[in-house]
Amino acid sequence: MLDMRQMLICSAILLTLSMGIRHGFGLWLQPMTQAMSWGREDFSLAMAVQNLTWGFAGIFSGMVADRFGAFRVIVVGILLYALGLFGMAHATTPLALLLSAGVLIGLAQAGTTYVVVYGIIGRNTPVEKRSYAMGLAAAAGSFGQFLMMPVEGFLISSLGWQQALMALATIALFLLPLTWGLREPAFAQGQSPRRDQTIVQALREALSYPSFQWLMAGFFVCGFQVVFIGVHLPSYLKDKGLGPEVAGYALALIGLFNVFGTYGVGLMGSRFSGRQLLTCNYLGRSVVISVFLWVPVSNWSVYIFSCCMGFLWLSTVPPTNGTVAKIFGLSHFSMLGGSVFFGHQLGSFMGVWLGGWLYDHTGSYDVVWYISIGLGLVAALFNWQVNESPIERGHPQVSAA
């Protein structure tokens, strides 16, 4: 097993930068579309494809990580990240933007974020410390969102949007040395864990299991909400007459309070069930968004909304992945984690694309906000039905009420 401190430090730095860089892509929406005379739908489609590619590729990166270890997957992911950022900086058509920011960076994220990292943590952490370790890793990714927002805003204002992307590509390459700290000894020696199921059997079992379906549907809602807000909130606030610095502070606050939320939910994982934590999270999101739309828009209403939403932002990730591990075990954990995350990314695709499409056709984001509220209520209902008991193969599941 890996040394736990080494594993958590390397995982934290990797997630800080890989998650942090992508969190700021909304800052590029207006400068890129204005400079290239594109519609918001063009940029939104590229971000939507990025999230969809991330989710779909995550299933396969999980398979490879389960079979051969995460080291090679992460190295390839980092190289693709740098290449995608370079291509995004030099995109001159919507198609080029879609291929670079959409496909390449989507593939990169599948190899450098939670799907792969949580597999390492699950295999190298005692079960009683797993929730804490996953919460700590999620908090690191959240800190990256807080850290990188002002960094990316500064790079854009000082270098211009194109050179800022080139700078981020260089930063991404500095992640390569960290991969040695995540090289699992057994995989490095050509060994892999013994499994009672094939990949196809494990995937078929999970996809036909009601609780996995509920988790996947709930994660769809999570993706819809957070990516819509992350990409379109800056433009929404500008349309409301607020300065660009308000959007920068808002996204930074989301990242900061996400640190507290993800770390806190990791600690609470030993006291409350995953379905309880997830149900409360999705209900809370609907309440927070409803209040935000109800009160007059001001700097302070935006900051309070960002703090509350940030606390709920990615605190779905540790209990969702922890519940998957409880039900199905660790043999195919990275693949199954990638599969449930695919639901998240389907939601991300819909949230970011629908936001741009409805804005271009109605001149407003209001409908998407209302959809987000309704989906939060549906996700709370879905997750309340999850049964976290380890699967008894060959026996039907009884849903928890």
Predicted regions and their residues:
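Intracellular juxtamembrane helix-capping segments at the cytosolic ends
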Residues: 32, 111-125, 315-328
